[in-house]
Swiss-Prot record:
Gene name per UniProt: potA
Name recorded for this polypeptide: Spermidine/putrescine import ATP-binding protein PotA
Presence of the UniProt keyword Ligase in the record: no
Species for this entry: Pseudomonas fluorescens (strain ATCC BAA-477 / NRRL B-23932 / Pf-5)
Primary location group: membrane
One Gene Ontology molecular-function label: ABC-type polyamine transporter activity
Length: 372
């Protein structure tokens, strides 16, 4: 692939973008030299806690804010200094901002009727596009209704359809599901992903909800304190976190302090805080004698009735019933406490009682070796 073709397959490229409010030398820094590539037709998520800079970055792509330094490329063209109306992007906000005095069809038509000179559509073209968008979000029979006659999920669909109607090259979504209840939010995730696949438009989605990010995304960028911590596919982010922040922010995990005792053929062996041998894990960067932290997801640990056949001896300290799962708190001989999650299946996972002794097994390759 030549350089020109590679550039053309990128929808958005963020190059050394920095955002400082107030004095550029002493003001608060919202973004610190961000570099990101977002591919054409990709569902890309900016994920992080409140204040991490994800919404600021989205607003700069939209043109609502401008970077202190750096470039924002849209299909290879720098748009960092352009106002919003000169950017072929649209935004769906957390609050849908539908016009209450207009019908749904009129809401969708409004943006099409307000196009700049040279891009004006005929009445027939606008009506056809409105019908297409209502069909896309399965709201054709509600065309004559007004927003206050809709549920929250229906309003969200119309806001999405209105943003897609002008054929944007990139659609920006700023936590659009956060106002919905859990069941509706889960249903809308499936619809969002299906609509993105059907339209082929690049979606850039902002959320603090890890489950949303893992469910929807082709790739995720995890942000913290104005910096990108890791970019990757959902399974990479979850199973191979680059640092302690990513491991802790995405899902649940156990952190185990350990020392590298042996490295051989791409595997590393470890000893725990009290010197107990811990299972080997794939690792090519650790060195013998190095202090590291192992991150192990609760579902990658398994309990058995005794500590035979390589299992570590442990004690059941607590049991929490979660419906589909059982969550155990266990302690090792040195006092290290770990969380173990097993399916709620009496046939395959006999329930262990609090206070009893048990054996703890690590899945091979289950631990991420964190060097920070």
């Amino acid at each position: 692939m030549n350089a020109l073709h590679a550039l053309q397959t990128l929808a958005v490229s963020i190059r050394s973008v920095r955002k400082v409010y107030g004095d550029p030398h002493s003001g608060p820094v919202a973004l610190k030299n961000i570099d990101l590539d977002i591919r054409d037709n990709e569902f890309f998520t900016l994920l992080g806690p409140s204040g991490c800079g994800k919404t600021t970055l989205l607003r700069m792509i939209a043109g609502f804010e401008f970077p202190t330094q750096g470039e924002i490329l849209l299909y290879g063209e720098n748009i960092a200094d352009r106002p919003p109306f000169e950017r072929p992007v649209n935004t769906v906000f957390q609050h849908y901002a539908l016009f209450p005095h207009m019908t749904l069809a009129e809401n969708l038509a409004f943006g099409l009727e307000s196009r700049p000179m040279g891009q004006v559509l005929s009445k027939a073209q606008i009506d056809e596009r409105v019908r297409e968008m209502l069909a896309l979000v399965q709201m054709e029979r509600f065309a004559a209704r007004k927003p206050n006659q809709l549920s929250g999920g229906q309003q969200q669909r119309i806001a999405l359809a209105r943003a897609l109607a002008p054929h944007p090259k990139v659609l920006l979504l700023d936590e659009p599901l956060s106002a919905l209840d859990l069941k509706l939010r889960q249903a809308m995730r499936e619809e969002l992903k299906a609509i993105q696949a059907k339209t082929g438009i690049t979606f850039i989605f902002v959320t603090h909800d890890q489950e949303e990010a893992l469910t929807l995304s082709d790739r995720i960028a995890v942000l913290s304190e104005g910096e990108v911590q890791q970019v990757g596919r959902p399974e990479e982010i979850y199973e191979q976190p680059r640092n302690r922040f990513v491991a802790d922010f995405i899902g649940e995990t156990n952190f185990i302090p350990a020392m590298v005792s042996r490295v051989e053929a791409g595997l590393a062996w470890f000893s725990g805080p009290a010197g107990q041998a811990l299972p080997a894990q794939p690792c090519t960067t650790a060195k013998v004698g190095q202090q590291v932290t192992l991150s192990v997801r609760p579902e990658r640990l398994h309990l058995r009735g005794d500590a035979s056949q390589g299992a570590l001896a442990c004690r059941i300290e607590a049991l929490i019933y979660l419906g589909t799962d059982l969550q155990y708190q266990v302690s090792l001989g040195d006092g290290t406490r770990l969380t173990v999650r097993t399916p709620n299946s009496l046939e395959h996972h006999p329930r262990l009682s609090v206070g009893s002794s048990a054996g703890l097994l690590f899945e091979r390759g289950s631990a991420s070796v964190l060097l920070d």
